[in-house]
Amino acid sequence: MKAIAYRGGVVTFRIPAHWREEYSDLEGGTFYEDRPDSGTLRLKVITVVAPKPLQSCSAMDVLHVVVNGMKSKGVEGTTSGRNDGNAVFKYELNSEEGVRHTIFNWIVANPIPPNRARVATFSYTMLASQRNRSQVQRDLEMLDAEIKATSFSERLGVVAE
């Protein structure tokens, strides 16, 4: 496994050592095994700002705001708090147009008092036909554990690379 210090360490997580990395200012980070039909992990990070300081904004509160609209459109998932004060919303989507894909998503909320929060969105896209392969299941278990262990810089903003 190798550590990824995304945007200089704003978000840090691990991926398999042999996976490739690509970065774009617009598209965020892309991580994948260099083989045909491999799954692709993507990461985007935003910082949200509340108009005034919040009394006790928790990561669960941030997730509620971020995913409330998704849930009203029928997206179902699981939300869990973490011991470090962050929280994760995990859900799955399936594309029905063209080549069928399954997309696993993790939204990780990181509150930054008094009135900001980082939201890291990880998505892992794969061919739907590969969903039940044992290697894919192992990759998903590994990604789930590593994403849930994601850490964030205490500094606000993009850390210089």
Tell me what each language-model feature is.
Residues 2-64:
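Secretory pathway targeting signatures of secreted, lumenal, and periplasmic proteins
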Residues 19-20, 75-78, 150:
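Short glycine-aromatic motifs
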Residues 31-36, 43, 91-93, 104-109, ...:
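Short beta-strand element of the conserved SAM-dependent methyltransferase core
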Residues 37-44, 52-55, 96-101, 128-134:
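Short, surface-exposed beta-strand/loop "edge" segments at domain boundaries and coil↔beta transitions
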Residues 39-47, 85-88, 117-124:
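Glycine-rich, often proline-containing surface loops adjacent to acidic residues and nearby aromatics
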Residues 63-115, 157-161:
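Signature of long, low-cysteine stretches enriched in small and polar/charged residues
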Residues 121-161:
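Surface-exposed amphipathic alpha-helical segments
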